Amino acid sequence: MSETAKKVIVGMSGGVDSSVSAWLLQQQGYQVEGLFMKNWEEDDGEEYCTAAADLADAQAVCDKLGIELHTVNFAAEYWDNVFELFLAEYKAGRTPNPDILCNKEIKFKAFLEFAAEDLGADYIATGHYVRRADVDGKSRLLRGLDSNKDQSYFLYTLSHEQIAQSLFPVGELEKPQVRKIAEDLGLVTAKKKDSTGICFIGERKFREFLGRYLPAQPGKIITVDGDEIGEHQGLMYHTLGQRKGLGIGGTKEGTEEPWYVVDKDVENNILVVAQGHEHPRLMSVGLIAQQLHWVDREPFTGTMRCTVKTRYRQTDIPCTVKALDDDRIEVIFDEPVAAVTPGQSAVFYNGEVCLGGGIIEQRLPLPV
């Protein structure tokens, strides 16, 4: 069977990137079908970009391209493997990244297995802005060509085996090119805005949404000097480095500089703040990470020089990584970094290649 006659199942989200991915694969001669995943049972009404509207858009695109669209419900898997962990992390005072977990457990596990076993797929494809390259018999994950849209940060948990079974057609393009293709084809998704909500849950108001599942516990806001200057509505609504939504202005003694969250005392339900986005209490010289995933699946020992991102869209930070044991590493930055947040992911790179990453267990504060 020739490479180009192979069957690809495209994860159709109802967005422009997956729509154009399906068309690009058709142009490359693959046998293309779509799959729409429903991963959340609750419908919050028409004001949100609901699964029903997304499904209608996905169906319209598939009709236009002349391909079959399958649907599958992964709501149970999403609840058990993504959402419960997401809530547990917030409860513990950390700030998780559900999109990374969703890619790991749903898009590149449940979807990959379903496509291969139930639909006879040779490959799956998604609209992620990443690229793959085969080096020394292993598939590597590369940054997307469009540096503004690169999504490798969200896919660091993938193994080389999963990458080998996945295609990323728009990773070779820039976003404006993708929209232009969709417009030229007359696809309904051409001008649809990019989704920014929690993976699969949509554009709900975050505080309201989280409050349904975790009871909020108001508590004190104190400065780094120990002065009480306000009340927070729940630690879970705040993350390190956050400026908005604190409800405090300048103080009589302080400057007019804005306040930032510099620490969360979970045990005592206290939010600690300081003025200025470069306050020493916000800065870290490094971090400890755990729950490590390396794309090549080789255990990491010793030390290495590379770059790291501690959040999406951050400029790469040069660093030295040292193995502490099988599942923990110490990362020392070349220069102090602001707002390193436990629960988020640290993702490592060697040039264009995403090496893997782990969950930030603790930050190493700047000695004061």
Curated annotation (Swiss-Prot):
The keyword RNA-binding applies. This is tRNA-specific 2-thiouridylase MnmA. CDD domains: MnmA_TRMU-like. The gene is mnmA. GO terms for biological process: tRNA wobble position uridine thiolation. InterPro entries: MnmA-like, MnmA-like_C, MnmA-like_central, MnmA-like_central_sf, Rossmann-like_a/b/a_fold. The active site is at residues 102, 199. ATP binds at residues 11-18, 37, 127. It is an enzyme of class 2 (transferase). Its EC number is 2.8.1.13.
